Amino acid sequence: MPIKKFDWSTLTRLEIYDYLQLLQKNIVNKRLTADAHYKILGNHIRKIAPIRVERKINYNVGRNNVIVGGQYNSEWDEENKKAITIFLYYCPFDKHLKMPAENFVFTSKNISDTILHEIIHMRQYRRRNFEYTKDYKSKEEQDHKRKEQSYLGCKDEIDAFSFNIACELYDRFGNRHKSIAKYLECKRPKKHCIYKYYLNTFNNDHNHPVMLQLKKKIKMYLPLAEMGKPFKNNNWIWY
């Protein structure tokens, strides 16, 4: 079923997060079945924008927690169907869960960041008339490492993750850009974050071409991270 026109540029990180936090009284420290938890959270997300929400099981999810994933489907978008899907991953052993406040805050931030990440992909594909882009050609011998590098080194992912990282850094450092620049050159960041994951994937090589592109993009996105959205206008994302 075709979707109505929607201006994706109106969504900001803080507004999505605040909207999700309206569920605190329904979710935080409430003993809910996994089905009930998903229904409450999923229905709320669907009211934000024309977004699909799916529940999945993942054995890496801790008890009383939810991991968030996302996907943009360019073929659905070209057919004017809902093209962004948010995946909510639950622990298979949680028949019931009682999510503490800090877990729900973390989940809400992840949902907000994932939605904006997928909107960036939407804009990328629309502006180039839905043409696919190539993955990065990794030279790693290990299959798992090669796949990770191929994915994270893709120009589309560098662009989208750069905004996510800029938001993480803004949360941590505010507008102290010198501190951010220093952090980006840190050999081994201590705090677990997307930037650290990139560094690990590319063998902690700050001069790797992918890392150089990533750092350049992060710095470009810092002013937009303060605004809470990755665009200054609604070109390609108002329909």
Can you describe what each PLM-predicted range is?
Residues 62-109, 119-126:
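Active-site scaffold of zinc-dependent metalloenzymes
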Residues 144-157, 162-239:
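Long, well-structured alpha-helical subdomains associated
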Residues 106, 110-111, 155, 159:
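Amphipathic alpha-helical recognition patches that constitute DNA-binding helices
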Residues 109, 125-153:
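Post-HEXXH active-site segment of zinc metalloproteases
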Residues 11-12, 27-31, 51, 105, ...:
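Compositionally biased low-complexity segments enriched in polar/charged residues
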Residues 118-134, 159, 166:
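Catalytic Zn2+-binding segment of zinc metalloproteases
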Residues 23-49:
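Zn2+-dependent metallopeptidase catalytic core
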